[in-house]
């Protein structure tokens, strides 16, 4: 690890994404995880050199350069407030946020650099660009977004499906959504444009959850030093 390693606080460290972030960050010499926040009091206070904290102890988290949040909606407000209070950027992939929480995000973007995204993969960033272009180029065509995820995913449609829908709506389409929860599907999104006698399908399939964690870690590095504002993944990586 270099002396100039980016100090990262991981919020939601006990979840699928949190565990992937911890594992991949440990392999990256440019990153130092200075704290991991979990929902309840941790059974071990230090794991592989990383201090663990309960969500109720968030205010006592050590100094960090950027926070990465993959938690639940009910845990989102405290990490957003902490970053705003300390003037540190935030990368968040927590989905299922309500309108009040989205408004809080917009307000916080006046103080800090932040990126909220339902999906941090480079492929989905490209897919979003393609959906935006297709919707604007194919006026009047039906637009349907089909998404499939593992049985444990609670929100539907997925945050990524809604993001793709926003891209389509912004270019004039009126998307409809279909959701499937089955097995251990990591994530599949199909955006279908249907006209008279022809159909266009844009598809992204994730086969490994690590792509999301890698993307979030990469976004965290790129967010360092950015002026206050709300950034999209594609603003940072494309």
UniProtKB/Swiss-Prot annotation:
NADP(+) binds at residue 40. It catalyses: (S)-2,3,4,5-tetrahydrodipicolinate + NAD(+) + H2O = (2S,4S)-4-hydroxy-2,3,4,5-tetrahydrodipicolinate + NADH + H(+); (S)-2,3,4,5-tetrahydrodipicolinate + NADP(+) + H2O = (2S,4S)-4-hydroxy-2,3,4,5-tetrahydrodipicolinate + NADPH + H(+). Its main location: cytoplasm. It is found in: Cytoplasm. Its EC number is 1.17.1.8. (S)-2,3,4,5-tetrahydrodipicolinate binds at residues 150, 159-160. One of its GO terms (cellular component) is cytosol. Signal peptide: none annotated. One of its GO terms (molecular function) is 4-hydroxy-tetrahydrodipicolinate reductase. NAD(+) binds at residues 12-17, 93-95, 117-120. GO terms for biological process: diaminopimelate biosynthetic process; lysine biosynthetic process via diaminopimelate. InterPro entries: DapB_C (IPR022663), DapB_N (IPR000846), DapB_N_CS (IPR022664), DHDPR_bac (IPR023940), NAD(P)-bd_dom_sf (IPR036291). Pathway: Amino-acid biosynthesis; L-lysine biosynthesis via DAP pathway; (S)-tetrahydrodipicolinate from L-aspartate: step 4/4. HAMAP family: DapB (MF_00102). This is 4-hydroxy-tetrahydrodipicolinate reductase. The lineage of its organism: Bacteria, Pseudomonadati, Pseudomonadota, Gammaproteobacteria, Lysobacterales. The gene is dapB.
């Amino acid at each position: 690890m270099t002396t100039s390693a980016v100090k990262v606080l991981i919020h939601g460290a006990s979840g699928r994404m949190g565990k992937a972030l911890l594992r991949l960050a440990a392999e990256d010499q440019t990153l130092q995880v200075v704290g991991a926040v979990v929902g309840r009091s941790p059974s071990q206070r230090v794991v592989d050199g990383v201090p663990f904290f309960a969500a109720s102890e968030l205010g006592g988290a050590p100094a960090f350069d950027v926070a990465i949040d993959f938690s639940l909606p009910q845990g989102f407000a405290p990490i957003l407030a902490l970053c705003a209070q300390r003037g540190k950027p935030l990368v968040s992939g927590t989905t299922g946020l309500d309108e009040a929480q989205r408004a809080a995000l917009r307000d916080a973007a006046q103080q800090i650099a932040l990126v909220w995204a339902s999906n941090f993969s480079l492929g989905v960033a490209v897919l979003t660009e393609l959906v935006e272009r297709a919707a604007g180029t194919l006026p009047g065509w039906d637009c349907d977004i089909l998404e499939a995820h593992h049985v444990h995913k609670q929100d539907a449609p997925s945050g990524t499906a809604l993001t793709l829908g926003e891209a389509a709506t912004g270019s004039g389409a009126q998307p409809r959504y279909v959701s499937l929860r089955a097995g251990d599907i990591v994530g599949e999104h199909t955006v279908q444009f249907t006209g008279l006698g022809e159909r266009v399908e844009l598809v992204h399939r994730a086969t490994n959850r690590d792509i999301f964690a890698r993307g979030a870690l990469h976004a965290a590095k790129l967010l360092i030093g950015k002026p206050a504002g709300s950034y999209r993944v594609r603003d940072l990586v494309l």
